[in-house]
Every structure is written in structure tokens, then in C-alpha cells.
């Protein structure tokens, strides 16, 4: 079939062949063909792109009228000599409580000596030497109370506390009361005292006391090794007596929490073991 078409085309006249097929040749275009993808305008494209530089916020400024040469609406002058501030009641009450608390602390008293019975060895030696020794002492709201140990030298005995509230310009003797001993047949007796403190005590005066034991026409004193037992204000408390190092013998042992015989032997050589504990009396 291809042969027939070629033959018919070649058998035509030259002029006929040129005129018949000339219209099939497409003319040359001066402009390129329009693409099928439509792009937006430059403005629309610019709006689609995120801005890279952030706009700076403008800071607000406040200016007063006098800076602009104008008159102020109202002028208020504050002075410390004006009327007192209107402080709320709860704040005023709080300030009063703080002041009263500070005053109470300045008027509170403390013991300016350690408890004598805290060091048992020293307490026992003082009792045997002086026949009397303060055992313990505590401060209550407006009173001082404690106990005294004395050797039972005779049946008739008197124990009293000699106390001063004005640095020994004057003093008062307060009798002690006998306390029945729990252990019968003990060679030591116990006395107690409870002394009320005065309402007003001058800050420059010292409160001191000593213990007196009268028996068989003789007097025995416990004056805390000549320093007396002092009661001072909390803010003036002397820590010298409370921080003195222990001057007793150094046994060179470490305490055993289970109470081994080596510990008891170091403290009390007369105790070879706990077998002799039953033969001992109370520590006082």
C-alpha cells in the first residue's frame, strides 16, 4: 500500500503538488508559546514569602505636662511632718507584738552555770568534801526551783538558799523543804526549794545565790567553788563557764554503747565487772 501512495504523489504535476500541500506548513511564531503553568503576580508572590526581618516595637514614653511647657493639673507635696500615716490596724498590732516580744526576750533570765549533777564524779567529790552540793536547778516563769543534796551528819539539820537580787547589797535566806528519800538507809538527804523572783530587777544588778547547810552547830557552804550560782539576762549570758573544757582525769577510753566492762572499769576502778553492781547504792 505504501507503494501506491508514493506512486500517486510522484505522478502529480509539480505545480499541483506545491499548491496542495503548502498550507500544511505552520508559520514561524515571533513569540514563544505560553506555558501551561500559570504563575501569580509579583505582588502575590511577595506576600507569600515570610518576612526575614522582624519589625521593631516602638517603646512607649511618658512625658509630663511641665516638660512640654504646660501647667500641671495638681501638685502634691509630701512631708514627714504631715499627719501620721493611716496604717492598717493589723500592721500596727504586728509591730506592737514584735516590740513586746523583743522586750520580753531582754527581760528573760537564764542560768549562768551548768547543772552540777551533770558531772557525777565532780558532784560526788564536792558532796563528800563540803557535805552539801546543789544537785539541779531550773528557771520557771517567775521563779527558780531545784534540789540540794547533803550528807546525813545528824537528824536535826537546816538547809537554806541565801540569795541576792542587787549584787549582795542585800540578801534573803529561803528555807528548803525536806524530800523523803526513795532508798531507805541512805547516808544522803535531799532538800528542795522554790523561790519567786521579783517583778522588777535592775539590768545592772546581778542575781546570785549559795547553799547553806547547818548541822551540829556548824555551817557548810556550797558557793559553786567561790563563784556563786548566777542568774543573768539572756542577752548578757556569759558562755565562759559553759564552754570551759573538762579538767577531770582522762581515762583514755571510748564509751561502748552496749556497756562493756572495760568502760565501767575505766570510770570506776572499784567495779571489776558488773557482778559488783548489786552491792552499790544509788548514785546520790
UniProtKB/Swiss-Prot annotation:
A Pfam family hit: CBM_21
Expressing tissues: Highly expressed in liver. Moderately expressed in kidney, heart, testis, spleen and lung. Weakly expressed in skeletal muscle (at protein level). Expressed predominantly in liver. Expressed moderately in heart. Expressed weakly in lung, kidney, spleen and skeletal muscle.
GO biological process assignments: glycogen metabolic process; negative regulation of glycogen catabolic process; positive regulation of glycogen biosynthetic process; regulation of glycogen biosynthetic process; regulation of glycogen catabolic process
Keyword match Phosphoprotein: yes
Domain annotation CBM21: ranges: 124-232
Keywords (A to Z) from UniProt: Carbohydrate metabolism, Glycogen metabolism, Phosphoprotein
Domain characteristics, as noted in the entry: The PP1-binding domain is located between residues 59 and 94. The glycogen-binding domain is located between residues 94 and 257. The PYGL-binding site lies in the C-terminal 16 amino acids.
PANTHER family xrefs: PROTEIN PHOSPHATASE 1 REGULATORY SUBUNIT, PROTEIN PHOSPHATASE 1 REGULATORY SUBUNIT 3B
Subunit relationships: Interacts with glycogen, PPP1CC catalytic subunit of PP1 and PYGL. Associates with glycogen particles. Forms complexes with debranching enzyme, glycogen phosphorylase, glycogen synthase and phosphorylase kinase which is necessary for its regulation of PP1 activity.
This protein's name: Protein phosphatase 1 regulatory subunit 3B
Organism whose genome encodes this protein: Rattus norvegicus
Lineage: Eukaryota, Metazoa, Chordata, Craniata, Vertebrata
Gene: Ppp1r3b
